[in-house]
Curated annotation (Swiss-Prot):
SUBUNIT field: Monomer. Part of the FGAM synthase complex composed of 1 PurL, 1 PurQ and 2 PurS subunits.
Keywords, alphabetical: ATP-binding, Cytoplasm, Ligase, Magnesium, Metal-binding, Nucleotide-binding, Purine biosynthesis
Protein name, per record: Phosphoribosylformylglycinamidine synthase subunit PurL
Family: Belongs to the FGAMS family.
Transmembrane helix in keyword set: no
Pfam families attached to this UniProt entry: AIRS (PF00586), AIRS_C (PF02769), FGAR-AT_linker (PF18072)
Binding site for Mg(2+) 1: E84, N524
Record: residues binding Mg(2+) 2: D108, D257
Binding positions (ATP): Y50, K82, D486, G523
E.C. number: 6.3.5.3
Active site: H47, H86 (proton acceptor)
Amino acid sequence: MQNQLTIKEIALELGISREEFDLIEEKLGRIPNEFETYLFSAQWSEHCGYKHSKHYLKKINESYESENAGYVQIGGKAVVFKVESHNHPSAVEPYQGAATGIGGIVRDILAMGARPIALLDSLKFGNVFDPKVKNIFEGVVSGISDYGNSIGVPTVGGETSFNEIYSTNPLINVMCVGVANKNHLASSHADGPDKLLVYVGSKTGRDGIHGASFASKKLSGKDDRPSVQVGDPFTEKNLIEATLEILKIKGVRACQDMGAAGVLSSTSEMAYKGGVGCELYLDNIPKRQEDIEPWEIMLSESQERMLFLVNPGTEKKVEAICNKYLIDFAVIGKTISTPHYVVKENSEGKVLADLPIDILVNAPEYYRNNTIPSTYILNKAKKYPKTKIKDIDKILKILLSNHNISSKKWIYQQYDYKVETNTIFIPEQADSAVLWLKKTQKAIAVTIDSNELYTYLDPFEGTKNVVYEAARNLISVGAKPLAITDNLNFGDPDDPEVSWQFEKSIEGLIEASKELSTPVVSGNVSFYNSYHETSIFPTPVIGMIGEIKDIKKIVNLKFKDCGDVVYLIGKTDINVDKIGGSFYLKVLEGFVGGEIDFVNPMYERYLQNFILDLIDKGILKSVHDVSKGGLLTALAVSCILSNRGFKGILDASIEELFGENQGRFIVSVRSKDSRIFEDIAKSSNINVKKLGEIKSSDDGIDICSAYFDLKELKSIYFDSISKSVEE
């Protein structure tokens, strides 16, 4: 009895609930031993088991997590992509948390047999004037920069937001894109018994132990640094090349990154997906410390490690490649026909665990009775405040200086965004990053987007807006949207209000993806983004990829020549009753509430096809989606980044200038093409409004009886973040 109580106490300490421990005992028909209890603590964690999200994720895609990443076919190639988070580790150890987040997502792409070609990130922080937040911000950017630059994968784009709700819970979401031969994609599924499990990469140490469990609970403020992994980008670079070579060997059957829960998760899931069991020999696993405990070996999340399944006789070829790249190699076990997960000290030694593999990998599925948050009702009922500042000059300058809208140059200038020479535009020059597919005329466009104000005020419509915003960003460079990857960042799933937000966000994602014919092919869920009793705003992050058929026809947001005519396309008349969630209200009025604007799916798709057609015809010289900060902010950014002035003919209210209604683009055309453009728009039933014409930089921006000196605006826009960091 004493032993049983001890095991149960260990289980509770490891995060297994009483009900879950009883369920394990019931399924096994016995009490697990201590070692097995450690295995369950990781595999049944939220991070590995998706306990609170599986019910909803099945509605998106039945094979949502079948492989390491999703892909689309473009130009005869498989373009592989996925986004993941490293939120908790980055809150505790910003530099290593962010760096190893890069390493992990790169290995997910690598495990598909794809060469990583680009990184993007979605970063959320609190107020950077807070010293603690500033430390996290600088550490995260440095970690991303050092790791990404060292492995030779460019960071080509992303977004960074600042909101006090993320002060103790920063969000570090990273997207990676890779390219592979469409006929040679690797699988993570074992394909039968009597195959060898081969370990490749760094040695196993104590870093990252309990990382999966750590990511499955609220941040407490305690020292959780032992749960944070430590990265080595130079080993990762060698691992990338070694993996791509190993996957060319005929006898290599499957590949899996050793991520969350390390050896345990990679081996058990590979075997389970293939309908077989496996047998592991711990003495064979390369170790940094000889005194490392068996359970530590299994749960360690030491970085830069991969698992391969190979035919017997193939291992020598794999070993030769590992020797070439100076990384560790070991045969650590084999697949077996019996569907059990067996762990031994060595091939002849003591059995430490013997578990039915389906019980180990299939955590329970929870479906809560959700509750509509009281804030949801209250926020919708809020009346917009009377405008305190009516001076357009002051409003625009305040918005351009706000860290959510100002240039992120301080961040991206630390990234090597041109390495491998695939990148067409430097960051911020276009609404999406564009990557050339070498030896073809095609390119891919990639973007990553979110809007926590929208998704807080209305998780369903807000998530739809984010998906459509991502699509607009691709349209703005001439790319047809193809597919989605997502990272769903939420608070405590045991809170019925958070669970409601999650469900509604999923429903919005599903509806928008169907409307745009952009399937969700991969993704991730990050729960427990809460500190004590405060959860973050619901923050679904959407990565989207699109195809550009002719790289010669791409456009960006920069105005080109003086005399070109500028138009607003789409919703030309703003609904002043639906400007809730706008940065104008948040920044100028300190107000978060009211109704957000909804997308019109049919019109939006028609509008997007219209823009793509005009880009293809060469009529549009620049395209810029109107989003954060509204119309005048978007117009000013195009002027700033192109070093061009603007003479406007617009007479508009503050709400029209700074509201954020959906489905709008700013475009420019040659003066000689303006009549043709207007005629095509009229015949296509597309709303357009002439805004003015492009002038020289010396002319500044003249609009709505206000004049802006371009040099002053450039200084405000480019220097805001750097001044805050350096203070």
